[in-house]
Amino acid sequence: MLTFLKTLFQPKQTNAALAWAAIQNKAGNKATSGYWLYAAPVHLVLQRDSFSLGAPAPLTLEADEIQALTNALNLHFNQDTGENNVQFFWHENVLFLRLDTNPNITTNAPQAALNKDINAFLPKGEGAIKWAKFTNEVQMLLFEHPVNLAREANKQATINSAWCYGLGKIE
């Protein structure tokens, strides 16, 4: 009975990231097997004792910003191994993340957390602690990235995190 009630009240997971990956895979493009998520570039706002997710989410980026951030993230997460265990892809104004291994998390779309304390909306599950470390690493890389320094100088919201959601697997 509890399982049935959870299905009624828990937010549905969006699998559009998986759908995009499947289409790309069939077309012979970038999508490869693995675990796929959206990775929405967002701006977290420091509140008195928490962070909230600032609107809009995802942030709108220029092509040069997208390219620079995607390159920096991919270089950082794959520099030690030379493998592509973690890959960020930008396609039609949407950022995707592909992982080799299941992160074992459940996620929420950023729209659910807009202008709210994000703690209730952060990924949950067996892999949540490891995921928090990964997210923190992304945030540290973004903090002083030249794209964000330029955005800050232009009085634009900085991209200080990636909100990942919509987990799905491609075989």
List PLM regions with ranges.
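An N-terminal, globular interaction/scaffold subdomain
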Residues: 1-66
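Soluble secreted/lumenal catalytic domains
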Residues: 28, 33-34, 50, 63-69, ...
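Broad, structure-driven detector of short, well-ordered beta-strand segments within folded domains
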Residues: 42-46, 162, 171
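Glycine-rich, often proline-containing surface loops adjacent to acidic residues and nearby aromatics
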Residues: 44-57, 94-95, 113-121
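Secondary-structure transition/turn motif
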Residues: 56, 98-103
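Extended, Lys/Arg-enriched charged tracts that mediate electrostatic binding to polyanionic substrates
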Residues: 58-88, 145-161
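Short, glycine/charge-rich beta-strand/loop segments that flank catalytic centers
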Residues: 85-98
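Loop-centered beta-sheet repeat module
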Residues: 101-170
